[in-house]
């Protein structure tokens, strides 16, 4: 066997780029935007343009790949191919402007929900569009087999390369004491998945489709995987779900909501297994495959009925959400698929094409996933507040008013006491709906209910470097409604870090050294010299209590902070010498060297410590 040369690999890479230029350009852009987001996630005031650019470019990888494959399969002219590529580019630009831009909500997860729908649609289109009019389903199967195998091998190679590079970096760190930022590992992973994996995938797609279509040997490993792994698992899951259905009938209990997700997962697993075994359906030695393929869809119908029953109960109680809408949509698709094959139709291309059509129809318009789910939860919230008389004439009857001249500090006007006429159940429902709307749609629709512009207040907090980053949109709106989760005023977090570069801890005079990290709810146990030492915060969270049996010592951390005048500093994140962050007990049995302090400054200027980390030194010798 002739070994691959560097020149051969270079030529293959160049050939792949020339064949799929827009695919690689999209991959390079997606990786560039993604690495920018990783690098500047904490410092950028608005990542939405870069997140949206990353997602749209990622969509372009599959979209342009599908366009080029479609053009090659249909033998379109260069001009027709350019027209399709221009249409694809226009679609991507249109999608970019439909993604959330940060105006209605600062939740950077929002664009990913729409991206997931479009991404699934584009991949499904790639799977069937080149063979949309072909009557040869085996050609369609062979084509998707090539895509599946190439994807699997590409991911495996990418994983091996990533692990190899990470091990190399770890070796450099251990042998040469060179430090690497944590972000570099994620950036390397993004580069490998985005650039190498994409390039490797497209380089293995034959230009001659006859080479794919005339393939009459099927991978033995794929058959073994489907027959001896997927099908036994599928049978087990079906037995579990049917056992649950029998339990429902015997106890006459309504099904739990989670069963909907299980049914969707099991149904999809079964359809995947049948697709992988499709070429063997007429094999005389494997007659059971044909029998199982026919009866599988009969077995699915009762489970689909349970799915609709379970999700219907959840919708009647809690309204429609994105997830519930998708479950209903997938339930409709499963019902259609079951009846299609039960009635004797055999074209497996209907599976991806029908799902793509449903997803595309549900991705836009007033009937779409996002509009219906937002309106459903908005109407639920409006109904709860109206019934409790908290909302009247589209205005909240009470709300906390904020001092705009104190922004980005969030400080309420004095002497405001809210008494919302909501019981505990209603309060929890309101909190849940506000969180959902904030995370998935934004809170624009409820802005008119308030007398103050909460959107501008939120922007003032987020865009100012001194703003409290822990305040998100849902928390601001709930606090304004008098429904703050903690029922405490907002407090700014301060951090003190020790400069540990080339620092060594002085241990003379002490017998034991132990590192520790202490949170508000924690108590830490340290064993030294056969004795037990318990560390915890004092009740007022101003210091640390060290207990050894009946012996107890308290060390004041608040006074240490005051002594170093850290509270007067304008910086929220302060770095000082570790020599200023040491404190001893009076009898010098204990010494704390603090490396990290997180605390809040209450309205009365008192310090309240949230977390500590550092080193505890213990001297067990008796002091005279």
Which residues make up each language-model segment?
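Hydrophobic alpha-helical transmembrane segments in integral membrane proteins
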Residues: 363-386, 390
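N-terminal signal-anchor module of multipass membrane proteins
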Residues: 1-76
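Hydrophobic alpha-helical transmembrane segments and adjacent interfacial helices
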Residues: 26-45, 62-72, 84-107, 121-130, ...
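Membrane-interface helix-loop-helix junctions at boundaries between adjacent transmembrane segments
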Residues: 71-85, 97-226
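Extracytosolic and intramembrane catalytic regions of membrane-associated proteins
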Residues: 392-624
């Amino acid at each position: 066997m002739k070994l691959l040369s560097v020149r051969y690999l270079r030529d293959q890479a160049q050939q792949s780029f020339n064949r799929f230029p827009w695919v690689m350009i999209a991959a390079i852009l997606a990786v560039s935007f993604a690495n920018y987001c990783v690098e500047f996630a904490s410092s950028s005031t608005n990542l939405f343009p870069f997140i949206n650019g990353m997602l749209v470019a990622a969509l372009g990888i599959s979209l342009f790949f599908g366009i080029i494959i479609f053009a090659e399969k249909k033998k379109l002219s260069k001009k027709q191919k350019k027209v399709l590529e221009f249409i694809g580019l226009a679609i991507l630009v249109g999608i970019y402007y439909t993604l959330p831009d940060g105006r209605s909500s600062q939740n950077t997860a929002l664009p990913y929900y729409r991206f997931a729908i479009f991404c699934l649609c584009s991949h499904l289109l790639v799977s069937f569009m080149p063979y949309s009019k072909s009557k040869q389903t085996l050609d369609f199967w062979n084509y998707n087999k090539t895509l599946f195998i190439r994807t699997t091998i590409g991911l495996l190679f990418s994983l091996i390369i990533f692990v190899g590079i990470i091990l190399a970096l770890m070796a450099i760190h251990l042998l040469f004491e060179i430090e690497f930022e944590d972000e570099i590992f994620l950036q390397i992973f993004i580069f490998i998945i985005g650039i190498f994996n994409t390039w490797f995938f497209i380089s293995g797609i034959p230009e001659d489709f006859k080479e794919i279509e005339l393939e009459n040997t099927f991978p033995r490993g794929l058959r073994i995987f489907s027959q001896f792994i997927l099908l036994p698992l599928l049978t087990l899951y079906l037995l579990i779900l049917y056992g649950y259905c029998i339990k429902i009938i015997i106890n006459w209990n309504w099904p739990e909501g989670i069963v909907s997700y299980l049914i969707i997962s099991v149904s999809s697993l079964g359809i995947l297994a049948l697709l992988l075994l499709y070429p063997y359906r007429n094999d005389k030695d494997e007659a059971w495959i044909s029998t199982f393929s026919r009866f599988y869809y009969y077995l699915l119908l009762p489970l689909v009925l349970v799915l609709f029953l379970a999700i219907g109960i959840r919708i009647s109680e809690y309204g429609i959400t994105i997830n519930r809408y998708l479950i209903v949509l997938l339930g409709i698709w499963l019902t259609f698929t079951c009846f299609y094959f039960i009635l004797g139709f055999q074209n497996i291309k209907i599976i991806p094409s029908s799902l793509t059509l449903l997803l595309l129809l549900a991705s836009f318009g007033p009937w779409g996933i996002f509009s219906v789910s937002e309106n459903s939860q908005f109407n639920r919230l409006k109904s709860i507040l109206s019934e409790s008389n908290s909302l009247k004439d589209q205005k909240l009857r009470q709300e906390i008013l904020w001092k705009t001249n104190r922004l980005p500090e969030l400080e309420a006007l004095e002497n405001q006491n809210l008494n919302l006429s909501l019981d505990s159940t209603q309060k929890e429902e309101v909190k849940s709906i506000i969180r959902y709307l904030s995370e998935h749609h934004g809170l624009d629709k409820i802005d008119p209910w308030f007398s103050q512009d909460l959107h501008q207040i939120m922007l003032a907090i987020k865009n100012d470097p001194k703003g409290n980053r822990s305040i998100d949109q849902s928390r601001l709106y709930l606090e304004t409604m008098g429904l703050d989760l903690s029922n405490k005023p907002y407090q700014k977090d301060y951090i003190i870090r020790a400069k540990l570069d080339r620092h060594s801890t002085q241990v003379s005079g002490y017998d034991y050294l132990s590192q520790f990290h202490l949170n508000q709810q924690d108590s830490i146990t340290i064993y030294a010299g056969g004795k037990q030492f318990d560390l915890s915060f004092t009740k007022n969270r101003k210091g640390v209590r060290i207990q050894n049996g009946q012996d107890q010592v308290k060390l004041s951390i608040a006074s240490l902070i005051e002594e170093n005048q850290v509270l007067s500093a304008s910086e929220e994140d302060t770095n000082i010498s570790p020599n200023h962050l040491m404190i001893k007990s009076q009898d010098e049995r204990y010494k704390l060297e603090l490396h990290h302090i997180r605390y809040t400054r209450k309205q009365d200027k008192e310090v309240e410590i949230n977390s500590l980390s550092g080193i505890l030194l213990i001297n067990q010798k008796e002091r005279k």
